[in-house]
Every structure is written in C-alpha cells, then in structure tokens.
Amino acid sequence: TLTHNILPRLMDYAPDFIVLQAGADGLEEDPQSGLCYSNHGYWSAVSAFLDLKIPILVLGGGGYNPFTTARAWAGVWGLMIGQNPHTTECVPASRSVLESLHFPHRLGKNIPERWVSRLYDRQ
C-alpha cells in the first residue's frame, strides 16, 4: 500500500522535491478505468504526498470522463490550498461549467446529478 510500502521507501531516498502525476483515468466512472477507485481514495493518496511536506509539483494527466476528471482535479487543487474536497458542494459558477460539458460516451447520456452538484463521489 501507499502508506506502508511506497512512502517509507520514498522517505529513505530523501528527495528534494516530488513530481506527482495525478492522472484521473483510474477513477471508477472513467471509461478507460480498470482500477475503479473513488475520488476519496484519489484525494487520500494526494494528501499522503502533501503531508510529507516536501516541495511537490502536481501534474494532471489521463481522465476520459470530463465530469470526474474536473471534479477530481478541483479536489486536488483544494487540498493543495488547505481545503477539504471530501464534502464540497459545487458553487453555481462551477456547476454551470460542469453542466456545459459535452461527453460523447454512453456514460454521458444521462449524467448523475452528483457529477454537477459536488466534488466527492460518495461518503
């Protein structure tokens, strides 16, 4: 696991900085996903790296469902400025942006309300 295997070895290496590729294509509702993790798990992993207090460059990448990708990355940005995305509802401006997205996939035909109303998938 991340906290028991990867992070201790990373700390043994004592990096000056971390480059974190925060791809969103492993999220459960991504059409390319074979991993099926929630954005809670995604954010928990990002938080674990941020908690190391090592300078970090977070890069976006991967993510083929624009709704889940936008919400996941917004949550990462929130974490980086000290906000808690795990319970964050979308403000009207962000909801408007999400509602305007086009997702030409079977998952995009009848989008769930939660894709435009909140950042988190489920509690």
Report each predicted region and the residues it spans.
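A general "terminal functional-core" signal
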Residues: 1-123
